[in-house]
Amino acid sequence: MVRISLDVMGGDYGPEVVIPGAARALERHPDIKFVLFGQEARCIELLAKHPKLKASSTFHDCEIAVGMDEKPSQALRRGRGKSSMWKAIDAINADEADVVVSAGNTGALMAMSVFCLRTMQGIQRPAIAAIWPTLKGESIVLDVGATIGADAQQLMDFALMGGAMARALFEVERPSVGLLNVGVEEIKGQEEVKEAGRLIREADVEGIEYYGFVEGDDIGRGTVDVVVTEGFSGNIALKAAEGTARQIAEYLRAAMSRTLLARVGYVFAKGAFDRLREKMDPRKVNGGVFLGLNGIVIKSHGGADAEGFAAAIDVGYDMVKNGLKAKIEADLARYHGAQPSEAVPRA
């Protein structure tokens, strides 16, 4: 059984997406036990439409929902101990859940997660890892927004955590790791990036295979299993890729409807276009993973639909099933000489 707590009020659409999304995920993974945190008045009728989900869940009424535009500091002051987001995270501390999934305000979710769960021993700052579609399948890119201007040691830690996530998600024994840079030559790039490369290379970590520097176009090619960068450039790369995918989809839609011949051609090529559309569907890779915390936190896109939110739940399910937290702790212990924590410290 995998116990998953949900911030039902999070995201642009709240329970109208979270509840049917959870129902879809339950169809795929019948061994999930959901712990739902939300405002009962908005959720009770929606839950009644999904009897299997209702039977596999416990519901906790919460008086506060964190707004999508709330500042993290305000969300902490107003929602600590009361909001659906806080309570969903704290369910990990209370040993009611193995992972939390929220589509809520990213800044507030990160602030509450750090405050409530704390960072793992040896980790200075957490990272957000994104699953990225590539020509070879999928890769992991981190950090995509949590730590702006990470230093060399933090990039080293990101490499360790990204490698552990790749082993958990892709079941690769020794995933390849590359540092995002402006060129592949050793003399190029910021000093922090060059120093991080030296740290990773000299550490010779058992769980990762250091590839060296990679450039932006290597991400989509799938040159490495894990791409490491700091949060500013990582977030720009993520948003640029999402925008490019939408742009290509619009180009194709316009081209296929421009003339009668194009529409006829589309009929014959529909299967190929459907496969392309599925490959480029952002819902399939929804679910950023907060790494470096004493608990697994999954961030869904705020505007995700039910299928997209279900995909984020899928990511959380896989991370628990494949022992992500234990893998990260073991790698950090080997590198930092620390012992894996016995229990999650309470906030």
UniProtKB/Swiss-Prot annotation:
It holds the Pfam family FA_synthesis. Keywords: Cytoplasm, Lipid biosynthesis, Lipid metabolism, Phospholipid biosynthesis, Phospholipid metabolism, Transferase. Disulfide bonds: none annotated. One of its GO terms (cellular component) is cytoplasm. Its EC number is 2.3.1.274. It is an enzyme of class 2 (transferase). It catalyses: a fatty acyl-[ACP] + phosphate = an acyl phosphate + holo-[ACP]. It is found in: Cytoplasm. Catalyzes the reversible formation of acyl-phosphate (acyl-PO(4)) from acyl-[acyl-carrier-protein] (acyl-ACP). This enzyme utilizes acyl-ACP as fatty acyl donor, but not acyl-CoA. Belongs to the PlsX family. This is Phosphate acyltransferase. It comes from Rhizobium meliloti (strain 1021) (Ensifer meliloti). The gene is plsX.
